[in-house]
Amino acid sequence: MKLKSLIKSTSDWFSSTPERALNRAYKSALKIQEIETKHFRGQKVSRENADYGASVITYFETEVQSYLQKINMELTVFKASRLFLSLSNLQDTENNLGTGKVKSEQETTAIIIFDKLKFIDEVIAKYKSNAIEKNVSNNVAIIAASERNPEVTNSAPSGKKSTKVKDQGVKNKTINFESASQKTGVLPRSFMNTLNKIKQEIDPKSGESEEQVLTKYRKSRYRTALSIKFILLLIIIPLLIHQLTKTFFLIPVVEQYFSRHEQVIFINRDLEDEALEELQHYEETLHFRGLIGLGPELSPEKIEQEVKQKAGEITEEYRRHGIDSIANIFADLFSFIAFVLVLVNSKKEIEVVKSFLDEILYGLSDPAKAFLIILFTDMFVGFHSPHGWEVILEGVAHHFGLPENREFNFLFIATFPVILDTVLKYWIFRYLNRISPSAVATYKNMNE
């Protein structure tokens, strides 16, 4: 009964998702209209439609951009959830097609949805496109253009810099960041950086140099913020998808299967052996405590009753473990799909993150690089790494409810660390040796 109530409440919550999302988008559109009516004579929020100062205009533009972002997000949720519900409820719609009351309610709901969507479109049509997405795209294009052609921003007059950068971003549809690993030449990179720094400091055009420093700082700050945000999204979204799908969808389905097949208790032989060993240990503990006087001496009937009660608890515990293990398999699959979708739809952000990580890793001192390489190799491919890999494999098997396979574990430990060590050595020889030869020399000395 409790399971049915939970499934019904969850189903009702999913069914009302499109309505909730549309209402939130509608309220955000009302907020934008309220700002336009009160402060901009019912027109678009811009400098041309009001006599406020720059700070006030910026404040209202930020508010509108925030509401536009909410509207776009809620409309995306509305479309996706409505499509999913329309596919899942197709049969119910066909069965109730002839009911006049149901048909009338559907028509009324459709009219309400149409009116709200029409109002939302009228509000956001004034702003042509999402201001926040446009700002992000422009910033990414500026970073990419300046990384590819530094002379675009360095040599142009201050009044024409933004125009040239923007034109460069329009001409190039794909953004290719020049990572630190690609900046190689005849002279060492540190030597060239020092010369460039001295040249900039003695440049008589000090005003232009200061502007370049500010531009570089803004670009670096934006790149750092975008990279951290994207990395957090890569972590949070799969975890959130995992918990939501497992809690509200997978576990109820698997529990329903186990309730129909009560004879299924253990999903593999290892779990059964663990349960029997635990039950046997409990029975022996009762005998032992009675013999040494730590507990009352129990009769065989009483011991059997206690063991029977413990067997019921163990059965419930291992059934729950089996349910969680099966749910983990599909929840991890959904998480992986969400992770891949985020990567596929974030190509620009990936370019920014790659450039950000390259600057951090290749900007470390030579001893720091050597220390991190030695730490990584000793941890994953060193002498003591087989014990760590064995613990990881046992944890993965327990997570998915798989029986432990010693032969597979030994085969994995004998091959995967070797492959990892080969890839690392190739990276040191192919890339690090060209970019930072002193770091490679330091690594060899520390490793010896």
From Swiss-Prot:
Localization: Cell inner membrane
Annotated InterPro entries: CemA
Gene Ontology CC terms, in alphabetical order: plasma membrane
Organism: Rippkaea orientalis (strain PCC 8801 / RF-1)
Function recorded in the entry: Required for H(+) efflux immediately after light irradiation to form a rapid H(+) concentration gradient across the thylakoid membranes. Together with PxcL, contributes to transient H(+) uptake following dark to light transition.
Transmembrane segments: 231-251, 323-343, 372-392, 408-428
Keyword vocabulary terms for this entry: Cell inner membrane, Cell membrane, Hydrogen ion transport, Ion transport, Membrane, Transmembrane, Transmembrane helix, Transport
HAMAP family reported for this sequence: CemA_PxcA
Lineage, opening ranks: Bacteria, Bacillati, Cyanobacteriota, Cyanophyceae, Oscillatoriophycideae
Cited Pfam families: CemA
Main location per the UniProt record: membrane
NCBIfam families (alphabetical): PRK02507.1-1
Family: Belongs to the CemA family.
Taxonomy, superkingdom: Bacteria
GO molecular function ontology, one term from the record: proton transmembrane transporter activity
Topology versus the membrane: Multi-pass membrane protein
Name recorded for this polypeptide: Proton extrusion protein PxcA
PANTHER family for the chain: CHLOROPLAST ENVELOPE MEMBRANE PROTEIN, CHLOROPLAST ENVELOPE MEMBRANE PROTEIN-RELATED
